[in-house]
Amino acid sequence: MNNIITLLILIGLTSCTGNKSQENPNNAVKSEFTEVIKEDYELYKPTKPIKAVLILFGGYPEVAEDVKREFKILEIAKEKDVAVILSNYNRKLWLEEDEKHQLARRLQEIIETHQLPTDNIYIGGFSSGGNVSLLVSNYIVGMKQFYIDPKGVFIIDSPIDLDAIYSTSEKNIERNFSAVSMQESAWIIETLGNSFGNPNDHLKEYEKSSVYIHRSDNTSNLQKLKSTKIRLYTEPDTLWWKTNRMADYEEMNAYYIKKLSESLQEQGFEHVEYIPTNNKGYRANGDRHPHSWSIVDKEDFINWMLEK
């Protein structure tokens, strides 16, 4: 599934330097934001009473600078008095238990340090950052030591099924569509294989770590989110993926995202929204790509966060 693989390695986004540490409250006079830049995150904090806190995770190689470039959310967040935390935490398709704990603890520390409200927190991300968002949110809600339970969680075209990624990579190698595809698919098979083995023989290992496994309809890593608002964004442009990656619909992130939404709704998750879009996916440089931050309607998204 070149669409899934592309999100991992060849998104083509640049990285920022990441070692800056500065606090610039003077910017608040002009922008009504206090800007805090640390090694592992950036915070944009409204100077007026904060109505909500938004925590964002980028795709596999993305850091805060990339997210700002691809997802122009800061201006409307400022207008609506929403604090935004842009995390530099990346390069994760899944989270081990200790990683969930460390990340949850770090998010709580950030919220404590900057005295952010905890009654209206939203966590989400693009691509693999969506996987991180769902997994850490489920962990936070299930652990009493944390008091930063998200009110809502969202993903943007995320590769939620690790079993599917593995099997699609095998198909990509068989197709031999391009050298890039071969390299990407080999990397996926090696990475997942070294961690979990072949899913045909070790599906239980995949179920322990994956957001969702369609083959067995496993959603065990989401069960704590039954009362949490969930949005699942994707752009199922089958023509684009077939033309550019030789991918069928059943090999797209969109397919598994829709199946997940159906599964959760059947289980009684009452606040799940599946949001397919059409021709909204464009990179900041103007390139057409359905696997993009831009598929999210930002005004509608902020209104969703602020609705009572």
Language-model features: where?
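Short amphipathic alpha-helix adjacent to the substrate-entry channel of hydrolases
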Residues: 66-85
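Sec-dependent N-terminal signal peptides
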Residues: 4-13
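Primarily recognizes the serine-hydrolase "nucleophile elbow" in alpha/beta-hydrolase
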Residues: 112-113, 119-176
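Alpha/beta-hydrolase active-site loop
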Residues: 94-115
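A domain-start/cap signature at the N-terminus of enzymes
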Residues: 16-52
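Short beta-strand element of the alpha/beta-hydrolase
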Residues: 50-60
